[in-house]
């Protein structure tokens, strides 16, 4: 089995840096174009005219090559940016698929014994029913918002806020 390790934030930062470098090079090429493609002869003799024409031809060839390199550079930056987005999406999907079963396994004994998870947010009360919001996890998690006229659920003891009360009610307490 092979593993791929990528840091999407670092890839996105590299793409931004490369885009900045590309725009700087593009500005330098645009500034140099007039001076390198239309070189004036130093004198009126044939040798000066021929040398100026040769330098001008080299300048035009450089500008054509530079335009091709700029096109490649833009495509590379776009591919790098898209790759960073793809890696970030894959990491998020992978984390979501791992986290849910793991949290279910951690919370199962606490739900069975205490009726409250160890980690996680409480469910919101149904609107218009007056149902209270669910309590958040014992350690971590926010309480759920209460339904109309009902209090919000309790938040976690270490981290988390009590849920917002429904219309006409107060918010939940900590713990």
UniProtKB/Swiss-Prot annotation:
It comes from Mycobacterium tuberculosis (strain ATCC 25618 / H37Rv). It comes from the Bacteria. Keywords: Cell wall, Secreted. Its main location: secreted. One of its GO terms (cellular component) is cell surface. The keyword Protein biosynthesis does not apply. The keyword Metal-binding does not apply. It is found in: Secreted, Cell wall; Cell surface. SUPFAM superfamilies: PE/PPE dimer-like (SSF140459). This is PE-PGRS family protein PE_PGRS8. Belongs to the mycobacterial PE family. PGRS subfamily. Residues 1-93 form the PE domain. Pfam families: PE. Gene3D superfamilies: HP0062-like domain.
């Amino acid at each position: 089995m092979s593993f791929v390790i990528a840091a999407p934030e670092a890839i996105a930062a590299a793409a931004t840096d490369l885009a900045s470098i590309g725009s700087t090079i593009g500005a330098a090429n645009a500034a140099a174009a007039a001076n390198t493609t239309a070189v004036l002869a130093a004198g009126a003799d044939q040798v000066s005219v021929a040398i100026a024409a040769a330098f001008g031809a080299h300048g035009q060839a450089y500008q054509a090559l530079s335009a091709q390199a700029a096109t490649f550079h833009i495509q590379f930056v776009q591919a790098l940016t898209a790759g960073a987005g793809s890696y970030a999406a894959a990491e998020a999907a992978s984390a979501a698929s791992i986290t849910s079963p793991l949290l279910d396994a951690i919370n199962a004994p606490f739900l069975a014994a205490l009726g409250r998870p160890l980690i996680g947010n409480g469910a919101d009360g149904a609107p218009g029913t007056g149902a209270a919001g669910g309590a958040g996890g014992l350690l971590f998690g926010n309480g759920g918002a209460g339904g109309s006229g009902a209090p919000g659920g309790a938040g976690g003891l270490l981290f988390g806020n009590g849920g917002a009360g429904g219309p006409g009610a107060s918010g939940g307490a900590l713990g």
